[in-house]
Amino acid sequence: MTSDASHMLEAALEQMDGIIAGTKTAADFSDGTCEPGLSPPSTCLNSMPVLHLIEDLRLALEMLALPQEREALLSQVPGPTATYIKEWFEDSLSQVNHHGAASNETYQERLARLEGDKESLILQVSVLTDQVEAQGEKIRDLEVCLEGHQVKLNAAEEMLQQELLSRTSLETQKLDLMTEVSELKLKLVGMEKEQKEQEEKQRKAEELLQELKHLKIKVEELENERNQYEWELKATKAEVAQLQEQVALKDAEIERLHSQLSRSAALHSDHAERDQEIHRLKMGMETLLVANEDKDRRIEELTGLLNKYLRVKEIVMATQGPSERTLSINEDEIEGSFRKWNTTNKSPEEVPKQEISPRCSSPTPGPPPLPQKSLESRAQKKLSCSLEDLRRESGDKCVDGNQLSPVGEPKDSSFLAEQKYPTLPGKLSGATPNGEAAKSPPTASLQPDSSGSSQPKLNRGWSVSAPVLRDTEGGWEDIVSSASSGTESSPQSPVTPDGKRSPKGIKKFWGKIRRTQSGNFNTDAPGMAEFRRGGLRATAGPRLSRTRDTKGQKCDANAPFAQWSTERVCTWMEDFGLGQYVIFARQWVTSGHTLLTATPQDMEKELGIKHPLHRKKLVLAVKAINAKQEETSALLDHIWVTRWLDDIGLPQYKDQFHESRVDGRMLQYLTVNDLLFLKVTSQLHHLSIKCAIHVLHVNKFNPNCLHRRPADESNLSPSEVVQWSNHRVMEWLRSVDLAEYAPNLRGSGVHGGLIILEPRFTGDTLAMLLNIPPQKTLLRRHLTTKFNALIGPEAEQEKRDKMASPAYTPLTTTAKVRPRKLGFSHFGNMRKKKFDESTDYICPMEPGDAVSDSHRVYGVYRGLSPLDNHELDGLDQVGQIS
C-alpha cells in the first residue's frame, strides 16, 4: 500500500513538469478561454491525469483507516514534495477565493510567478532525483545482500543435506553399536556369572582355610587343655596321695593318743579336758573328710572335662579324617590312668574304717610327684583350710623306712603340767620369714625305688602341703621324668625308632605338630616347653627358689657355638626373640653345628621359618656368635628398634618391624628389599631410615644418641642438630613461632639426620611437609631463614650446589621406591640369589670406617655419609625382585 502511494506521488510530480511547461495554456483553459494562435484545445486536456492521480491519492488515503499508517506514509513523503503540494493546494484555494482579483492580474505577472514556481519545482525535482538515486544505490546494496544471503541459504541447505546424511549414517552406527553393546552386555553377564562362580569358589576355599585354621587353633587349644588337665590330674594324684598319707598319720596319731590316754588316765582325772581333746580330734577328722570330699568333687570335675575334651577330639578327628590318627592321644591309656587312680582313691567313708596299728607301714604309693613349679602353683590354691589346720596341728613326726615312730612321751609330771594339751603335737618348725628353711634337719627325702618310680617319704620338718624348696630342682625333675617315662608310657603309640612321628595327611598342611602321650611327661617334648620353669607359662608372682640351671650350661659356658647342646640352642633362640620356632628346633637341631651348616632353605624347610627377615636375623646372629664378633648393634633388640622408629618419626612401621623382629644388627645389614618387604615404599621414608642408620653408625650404635628434649637454644651446631629426634624438631618449630604446623611432622620421618645429611632436603621441602600453603610467602620465607640458620653454612652451601646441578630433582612426598625391573639376562642371577641373600645394604658403612677428621664436626657426618648423589637420584630404581 505504501509503495503504491509512492509511485502515484512520483507520477504526479512528473505530470507537474508538464503543467509547468504549459502553464499559460492551462490557465487559459481554466478560465474557459483559448486565445487564437496558441496550442489547440487538446493540450488543455493534459491536466486530466493529474486530476485522476489526485483522486486516486485521495482514495488511497481513505483506504488507510489507521492513523499510524497515514503517519508512516507521510513520513516517507519527501519534505520538498509535501511543501510543494501544500503550497499548490493553498494557491489553488487562494485562486478560488480570489478569482475575481486574480482575473485582473496581467499575464506577465502570472508568468513571473509561474517561473518562480518552476524554479522551486526544479529545485525540488533535483532534490527528489538525488533521493531517488540514493535509494537506488540502497536497493542495489540490498540486492547484493540478498544475493549473498541467497548463497548462504544455498550453502546452509547443502550443509543441512550433508548433516542429514551424516545423521543417517550415525543412526546406522548407533544401531550397530547398540547391537554390539547388547552382545557385550551378554558377555558381561556371562563374565559376571563366571566371576561370581570364581568368587564363590574362592570364598569357599577361604572358608575352608579359615575352618582349617580354626580347627588347628582348636586342636592346639585342646592340646593345651589336655596338658593342663594332665598336670592337674597328676597334681590331684599327688595331693590325694598326700591326703592318704595324712589320713594314715592321723589314724596312727589317734591310736597313739588313745594309748596315751589309756596310760595317762590315772594322772588326769579331768574328763572335761579329755572330752574336749577327743572332740577336737573328731573335728579334725571331719575336716579331713570334708577335704577328701572336695578332692573327690575336683576329680569328678576333671573327669568331666576330660570326657568333654575326648568328645571334642572325636569331632575334630571326624573332620580331619583318618590321616590324623597319629595325632590323637591314647584313650585306653587315659582310662587306665583313671582306673589306676580310682583304685588308689578311697571313698571318704572308708577312710576312718581302716585299722592302722600304731607302728603302721608306709602309705600306699601314689602317682609320681609333680615338678616343683606345679606344687608351688597349686599348694595354696588346691588344699582346703582343714589341711592348713592339720598342718599347724601336726607335730614332730619321723617316718624312717616303713615305720612311723610316735612322739616321745613326757618323762615327768612337771612337763605335763606345762602343756595344756599334752597329747597334741607341738608346732611345726616352719620356714623363716626370708624363705629359708628352719635349722631342724629333715629326716626323710624323696628316694626312687627299684621300679623307677619315686616313693614319697614325708619330711616332717616341713609342712605337708607346702612344696619342698631346694636350691636346685634337677633331682626332682629327673625323678619325675624317670618315673613318668618308666611307669606310665604306653607302647601303643606309633612312633619311629628315632622317637619322631612320621607326618601324614593333612598334618603336612598344618605343620609339624608333636603331641605327647597321655601319661608321658617328657621335659624335652615340644608341648611341655611352655611348662618349663622360668618360661612364658611360669608361676605368677615371685619365685620360691633359685631357677634351675640347664644341664650342660655350667660345663660348656665357654664352648664354641658348634658344640652347644639342643637345649642351649633353643634357650638362645627363645631369648633371641625367635621362640616360636623352638618347637621345631628341638626336633631338628642336634647341636649348634646344625645351625652353622644350615642354609636359609634348610631353615625354611626344617624349622618352618617362612619369614625371610626371621631367617636373616637367625643367619646374622649365628655368624656373629660363631665368629665371636663384638658388635654394639647386637645389644639393641627389636623392642628398642620400635622405640627408635618413634624417635625418627616413623611410628606407622612399628608393627611391621616388630613382627619381623628387626633388631640393631639387622638395621646394620638392612637392604632396600628388606624395606620394601616391610612395606616402606616412600622414597622420603627410605632416606629418613638411611640417614638415621648413618647417625647410629657414627655414634657406634649408642642407644641414647638421639636427643628428645630441648637443650641450649642459643648455641646450636649441626653436630647437635644431626642427633635431633622427630619430637625435638617439632620443639624447634614451636620455638620459631610455627607451633600450629608442628603436629604435621608426626609420621613424616623428619629428624635431625635427614635435615643435615640429605642434600635435597631444603626449607621448601620442610614447608611442603608442614602443609604451609604456597600463597603464604612471608611464612615460607621465615621458615627458610630459620632453617638455613639451623643447618649452618656448610650444609646450606651443599644444598645449593645440589640444587644447581643439572640432574637435580626435588624431593617430594609422593615419590615411591619400586623394585628394579629385571630383563631376561638377569633371570639366571635371580634364580641363584634369594631374598635374604641380597647385599644391597641401605647404609653399608661399617663402624670401623670412621675418618679421623674430628676438627670438623660436620665433616664427621658428611665425610662418612653413604648418601652419594647418583644413589639419591636413582633411589626409585633400586630394589630387586626375588
From Swiss-Prot:
Which residues are annotated as modified residue Phosphoserine in the UniProt record? Answer: S328, S362, S386, S502, S518
Pinpoint the SAM domain residues: 564-628, 636-699, 724-789
Q: Where is the composition biased (Basic residues)?
A: 502-515
Biased composition (Basic and acidic residues) is annotated at: 388-399
Which intervals of the chain are annotated as region Disordered? 339-554
Give the stretches traversing the membrane. Answer: none
Matching Gene3D superfamilies: Transcription Factor, Ets-1 (1.10.150.50)
Q: Where is the composition biased (Polar residues)?
A: 442-457, 481-495
Tissue expression per record: Expressed widely. Strong expression in liver, kidney, intestine, heart, lung and testis. Low expression in brain and thymus.
Coiled-coil region(s) = 101-303
Single Gene Ontology MF annotation: identical protein binding
What the record says about family reads: Belongs to the liprin family. Liprin-beta subfamily.
Alphabetical list of PANTHER family matching this protein = LAR INTERACTING PROTEIN LIP -RELATED PROTEIN, LIPRIN-BETA-2
The protein's role, per its UniProt record: May regulate the disassembly of focal adhesions. Did not bind receptor-like tyrosine phosphatases type 2A.
Domain-related comment: The N-terminal coiled coil regions mediate homodimerization preferentially and heterodimerization type beta/beta. The C-terminal, non-coiled coil regions mediate heterodimerization type beta/alpha.
Q: What is this protein called?
A: Liprin-beta-2
Instruction: Please report the organism this UniProt entry assigns to the protein.
Output: Mus musculus (Mouse)
The gene behind this protein is Ppfibp2
